[in-house]
Amino acid sequence: MSTLTPREIVSELDRFVVGQEKAKRMVAVAMRNRWRRQRLEPSLRDEVAPKNIIMMGPTGVGKTEIARRLARLCGAPFIKVEATKYTEVGYVGRDVESMVRDLMEIGVSLIRDEEATRVRARAEAAAEERLLDLLLPQSPADGGETRQSTRDKLRGLWRQGHLDDREVDMEVEESTKGPQMDIFAMPGMESMGNQFRDLMGKAFPARRKMRKMKLREAWNLLVDEEASRLLDQDKVVDIARERVEQTGIIFIDELDKVASGEGTHRTTDISREGVQRDLLPIVEGSVVNTKYGMVRTDHILFIAAGAFHFSKPSDLIPELQGRFPLRVELDALGRDEFYRILTEPHNALTRQYAALLATEGVTVSFTDDGLREIAAFAEEVNEETENIGARRLYTMMERILADISFDAPDRPGEHVTVDAAYVRTHLEDVRVDKDLSRYIL
């Protein structure tokens, strides 16, 4: 588990998300409390439940990005789900327990990758020997010293990269599609479907076939196979289950859409309340059956988010409200924040587009007045049409750089400066025609 202090967590989040200090501080404390909990006596540790969070704010202000970056920072299994995708038990659709099953799948994949990295050196050594066997098959006529000498020469050529494009015949698993199990897509039967597929996989193991491929591709497959052999799959599952139960994060987006606020009909209120009641035991802490065994949700951190334009957290059922004790409102973004988003983050849009076009030999630079003009346009369009927050910058940048992106292969070595005049030239028609801005931006 990460030992970063709340201040260090906020500092790391600042590299990717502009503003929203209150939200950053709240999630940083929530993560630090997990570290603190692990240092308690076992008898008290189980009593300390995570303080789940509701983030309120319009779209495009950083709700999802804060949660996603937090999970990466802490190495925690993370999944983003949408509350509207689930239905209450008895109706066609996914049941809420499937989010825990999906989180467990992500946890297993995360641990498998970590363990594969740990044994990669051994896997590469074994894969290299198998690769040389493909290049130099065993022959009774070969002398021991002659064969070893040839093998060493091939090893040297391979390590120098001279054999990457040579083709070999290699036996690989045949990827066969299993029978469609649509019957198990019914509510409450997903777990049974997973168990049935596992049973079918054991009863009918995958067939192998010979395939011609380049040596570099064969090398990658052999490394994966050897790493898989070196891994203790039971250990991987045990570690993953522990990681999911103790550090897992489930981000539930659009929670406001299942709240019974103003303008909702009685029939939809009933359906929405059903989803909330199904969510309740998962958030409170229960045991969910997965293909990897039982997973407890008592200490999984739930971060919910929503715009809450037509409803408010108090419209949720009281029991669910009580399970989200922490609430924070994220600020809407204006031109100052848009300017900072274009310049400050480690993965700023301007850096992304400049790097993409640099692959074609085209150098793109942005002046300060050009960036401020983009920010002003984004704020203006958001005010006059739908406010989609920072996502507006994507559409603005695409329109501004559309011509150069199309012509880049024919203009290597060229330098393009995006200043205020360049921005106005490419966006002025949209500003003049307000109806056009609704469709283009």
From Swiss-Prot:
It comes from the Bacteria. GO terms for biological process: protein unfolding; proteolysis involved in protein catabolic process. Gene3D superfamilies: 1.10.8.60, DNA helicase RuvA subunit, C-terminal domain, P-loop containing nucleotide triphosphate hydrolases. It holds the Pfam family AAA_2. InterPro entries: AAA+_ATPase, ATP-dep_Clp_protease_ClpX, ATPase_AAA_core, Clp_ATPase_C, HslU, P-loop_NTPase. A double ring-shaped homohexamer of HslV is capped on each side by a ring-shaped HslU homohexamer. The assembly of the HslU/HslV complex is dependent on binding of ATP. This is ATP-dependent protease ATPase subunit HslU.
